[in-house]
Structures are given as structure tokens and as C-alpha cells.
From Swiss-Prot:
CDD domains: MADS_MEF2_like
SUPFAM superfamilies cross-referenced by the UniProt entry: SRF-like
Record's protein name: Floral homeotic protein APETALA 1
Purpose: Transcription factor that promotes early floral meristem identity in synergy with LEAFY. Displays a redundant function with CAULIFLOWER in the up-regulation of LEAFY. Required subsequently for the transition of an inflorescence meristem into a floral meristem, and for the normal development of sepals and petals in flowers. Regulates positively B class homeotic proteins.
Species classification: Eukaryota, Viridiplantae, Streptophyta, Embryophyta, Tracheophyta
């Protein structure tokens, strides 16, 4: 009885998967070498493991030449095929490509919002969770950076305001000091020891020359009394001082 067809599917056991990869890789490299020797063909083989490790094989170790040749051929083939292609077909392919991209973006957006999660496998959910955690870390980092910059800006403004207040306070103190010095100098000038006190405003008026000769002043009368404040006595004394000497003089003349 022959052996049945083995169903191709992913090997879940990690160790078995690694062993199978090593065996199949060795067989694949052997087949590439055989075809290059038997058929005189230029062969280039590139294999990446699930961990990202590179395995390659090329005829006569000329991988770069084979890749350059492949690139030139692909570019030339595209240039030849492009003019012959139908324009409508290109637009249809572009439309389908963009439509598929839009559907993928919409599905990812729903997943990010926590919607349509029933059809996702545990591995897909784990990947989605990791993406959301990474996005949250970026968001928190950016938010903290903005808050830190805002705090620094506010601290700079506060420092500038404090410096301005200190400068204004010093200016006010200096002006008060100057004002006090000027006030003390003014008081010393107005209240000096050799300067009489200022007169009231009405006494600073200029008097008429006639009034200078009619100011009351003290004098003696013939009776020997000192008169100063009585106006009637002043008039009487004026008369006595004026006429009595004349009368005495006349009497003396007659007696002689």
C-alpha cells in the first residue's frame, strides 16, 4: 500500500519546524547546485528563516551579477509590456488596488476602536494589543513632552516677571530716597538758624511810602508817662510836644 499525500500546512511545534527547515533548506541548496552544474544555468537562491536569518546560494559566487541581470531584464520587460497593455485594464487594476487598501484601512480602524473583533484570531488580537500599547506610549511621551515644555515656558515667564518686579521695586526705593533727601534739604533751607520764619502772605505786600512815616512809635509826654497803644493819648502827646515848648520859649523871651 502506497503512502498517502501529506497535507501541507504550518508545523506548530517549534522544534519540528526548525528541523524541517534545516533539512528542506539543505535539499533546496543541493537541487540548486545540481541544476546549475547539469544544465549550465546561472542560479541565485535567497532564503530567510522565520527569525530573519539569511541563507543564499549563487553560481560561482556571483550573486550581485545575477541580481543586476535580473533587474535589467525586469525593467526592460516592463518597458516593453507597458505600451501594449490596455489603459482600461490599468485603471481597473489601480481601482481594485486602491479599493482593497481602503477596505484594509477601514478594517484596521474598526479594530483600533474595538469593533469587529469576533473574526480575529488570538495572535491577531495580541498583535493589535501590542500596536495599541505602542501607540499609547507614543501618545503619553508626546503629552509629557508638551507639558514639560509648557511648564518650562511658564517658569521662564514667572522668572522674567519677578525680575521686572524687583527692578521696579528698586527704582521706587531709589526715587523715595531721592525725594526724602530733597525734602530734608528743603526743610533745612526753610528752617535755618539765621533765616526768620516766613511771613503770612498779607504781610508781604508793599506799603505806601506815606504810611512809613505814620507808624505808631513810643514817646514821652511832659508828665513822664510812657504811651504806646492809646491813640487818643498819642494825639494828646503830639499836641503837648508841639505847643508847650513854643509857649515856654515865648515866656522866656518876655522874661528877658
Amino acid at each position: 500500500m502506497g503512502r498517502g499525500r501529506v497535507q501541507l500546512k504550518r508545523i506548530e511545534n517549534k522544534i519540528n519546524r526548525q528541523v524541517t527547515f534545516s533539512k528542506r533548506r539543505a535539499g533546496l541548496l543541493k537541487k540548486a547546485h545540481e541544476i546549475s552544474v547539469l544544465c549550465d544555468a546561472e542560479v541565485a537562491l535567497v532564503v530567510f528563516s522565520h527569525k530573519g536569518k539569511l541563507f543564499e546560494y549563487s553560481t560561482d559566487s556571483c550573486m550581485e551579477k545575477i541580481l543586476e541581470r535580473y533587474e535589467r531584464y525586469s525593467y526592460a520587460e516592463r518597458q516593453l509590456i507597458a505600451p501594449e497593455s490596455d489603459v482600461n485594464t490599468n485603471w481597473s487594476m489601480e481601482y481594485n488596488r486602491l479599493k482593497a487598501k481602503i477596505e484594509l484601512l477601514e478594517r484596521n480602524q474598526r479594530h483600533y476602536l474595538g469593533e469587529d473583533l469576533q473574526a480575529m484570531s488570538p495572535k491577531e488580537l495580541q498583535n493589535l494589543e501590542q500596536q495599541l500599547d505602542t501607540a499609547l506610549k507614543h501618545i503619553r511621551t508626546r503629552k509629557n513632552q508638551l507639558m514639560y515644555e509648557s511648564i518650562n515656558e511658564l517658569q521662564k515667564k514667572e522668572k522674567a516677571i519677578q525680575e521686572q518686579n524687583s527692578m521696579l521695586f528698586k527704582q521706587i526705593k531709589e526715587r523715595e530716597k531721592i525725594f526724602r533727601a530733597q525734602q530734608e534739604q528743603w526743610d533745612q533751607q526753610n528752617q535755618g538758624p539765621n533765616m526768620p520764619p516766613p511771613l503770612p502772605p498779607q504781610q508781604h505786600q508793599i506799603q505806601h511810602p506815606y504810611m512809613l512815616f505814620h507808624q505808631p512809635f513810643p514817646f514821652f509826654n511832659m508828665g513822664g508817662l510812657y504811651q504806646e497803644d492809646d491813640p487818643m493819648a498819642m494825639r494828646r502827646n503830639d499836641l503837648e510836644l508841639t505847643f508847650e515848648p513854643v509857649y515856654n520859649c515865648n515866656l522866656g523871651c518876655f522874661a528877658a
